[in-house]
Amino acid sequence: MFYIATFIIRFICELNKNNKNQVNCLVVDDTMIERCRGKKVELLSRQYNHVIGKTVKVFTNLALGWTDSINYVPLLSHLIASNKEKNLIQKSNTSNIDNRTTGAKRRLLACKKKPEVLISMCRKAMKAIPASYILMDSWFFSDFSCKKA
């Protein structure tokens, strides 16, 4: 998906190369995907949802996209579980999985903190596409993110 998205973005930038007002931005969003049932779903975790005021069973989808204020192209997406073991409902079963596989790498990435994953996503995107700004929620902008970026 990432390589197709970079092709589309380069095509859009080529069409708009004469537009001096075009601003290319990366957009970061984290969305809770609630799952009411699932005691045995791997890496499902409990998190507090501030909108409804309760703790719910969720996966968190961390998404990175590109925009030029007219078009939006999704780039990368990762499901993030809680990195605290007490919040995990079902831990990852990595005992019989080869660590070289994509699934094992995704499981390791799912247990990292969101700012760590965000930084790796932004670095990958900045190598491939033009972007002047990164738009995100204020909580992403922490001391950790500033030092690592």
What are these language model-derived features?
Residues M1-L135, W139-A149:
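Conserved, well-structured functional cores that handle cations and Mg-NTP chemistry
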